[in-house]
Amino acid sequence: MTFRLTRALCGAMLALGMMVATIAPAAAQYWQCAPYAREISGIQIFGNANTWWSQSEGKYAHGAAPKVGAVMAFKANGRMRVGHVAMVSGIVSDREVLLTHANWSRGGQIERDVRAIDVSSAGDWSEVKVWFGPIGDLGQTRFPVYGFIYADQPAAEKPMQIASLSGGSSAQKLRK
């Protein structure tokens, strides 16, 4: 092998190595469900998914009706020990929604607009089945759900009574 050929091969390998090193960090993004749901919904709650429902109390309105942009909060269950959160990206019917979420079908990956159906006997979204990529269909597992946290609605403001600074017995009611 000539010096020129060796030098050219080394240069090509170095250039290829730099391209792979540049691409690798972006391709290696691994999303957990909670940080991804926070990123796309704007709901500023931190910690494991199974704590989002209780943490939303007093900060965000929540309920049993799905709305686009709301976060569906799953309870911890079986192999899903820390719960799950997913943003509602579409409403198909009163018992079917589309979810956008991470770390469900494949570890760390994002799935957009996948089906979830209400399988609760009361039709109250307390139990759902969710699309599972590896089988190309809804899974068999029925997942318990707390409900939906609404990103665009702050919790109802409650009056707060504070003492008067004048030393009198009158008090003022203020809104938070």
Predicted regions and their residues:
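C-terminal segment of classical bacterial N-terminal signal peptides
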Residues: 8, 16-26
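Extended, non-globular or repeat-rich regions with surface exposure
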Residues: 4, 24, 165-168
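Intrinsically disordered, low-complexity segments enriched in polar/charged residues with Gly/Pro
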Residues: 5-6, 49-52, 75-76, 117, ...
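Aromatic- and glycine-rich peptidoglycan recognition patches
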Residues: 93-176
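Bacterial N-terminal signal peptides that target proteins for export
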Residues: 2-13
